[in-house]
Amino acid sequence: MDIVLLIKAAIMGLVEGLTEFLPISSTGHLILAGTLLGFDNEVGKVFDIAIQTGAIFAVILVYWQKIRDTLVALPTEKQAQRFSLNVLIAFVPAVVLGLLFGKAIKAHLFTPVVVASTFIIGGFIILWAERRQEKNPAAVRIHDVESMTPMDALKVGLAQCLAMIPGTSRSGATIIGGMLLGLSRKAATDFSFYLAIPTLIGAGVYSLFKERALLSMADLPTFAVGLVVSFFSAWLCIRWLLRYIASHSFVGFAYYRIVFGVVVLATAWSGAVTWAA
């Protein structure tokens, strides 16, 4: 058993867990971490699915009571039915656009300049969204996910599609998109996490099917370590974020994105890091 490889797997799992649900783009961080650690080969594509699975389990655990109650009430209660429908509606655009354009996006947009640019642009959009909500509190019309309409859900789902561009951040696109549509910071974050469950599961199953030829029992210990570390780090991160947003904005994440994007550009242009995008 290669101990160094297991340590690298743990680091990648930690990066995934800490960045998947924050508005800072797990994809961008995984590309950089994978390059630095030498985890950017073909098997790395399947490994990314494994660590993403850990993150999925984490969000399911955090929201398990709500998920369980919704499933139990689904046959009889309209509120549960509407909530489930909203998640489904928000999920559909990513499926359609992902199937249509996913391959082309991966072929042409996974470059250092694109990743860094979306980091920076996303940071300024977060600053704008936060200042807009601060200056006009009346713009917040939805304070919980149960109050969302199907049209609200569709718009958040369309915002999620922006995350197909590497460096955007799925959680960032859905949370900030939701806030710009009138959701409170808490409601937007909650709905983003609920939407993550079908989105990440769907993307993972599809990617696993495409890359099934790369699967090997020899890689199982590496995948298991990455998955477990991703699960625990994502669980801690989600719980921390839900407490954090109760009294803080996303401004700190915006500045982090901008600085990180500048660093990526600088390292790419200077040749200090050869990105395997």
Swiss-Prot record:
Compartments in which it is found: Cell inner membrane
Species of the source: Albidiferax ferrireducens (strain ATCC BAA-621 / DSM 15236 / T118) (Rhodoferax ferrireducens)
GO biological process terms, semicolon-separated: cell wall organization; peptidoglycan biosynthetic process; regulation of cell shape; response to antibiotic
HAMAP family from the UniProt entry: Undec_diphosphatase
Superkingdom of source: Bacteria
GO MF annotations, alphabetized: undecaprenyl-diphosphatase activity
Name this polypeptide is given: Undecaprenyl-diphosphatase
Phylogenetic placement of the source organism: Bacteria, Pseudomonadati, Pseudomonadota, Betaproteobacteria, Burkholderiales
Function: Catalyzes the dephosphorylation of undecaprenyl diphosphate (UPP). Confers resistance to bacitracin.
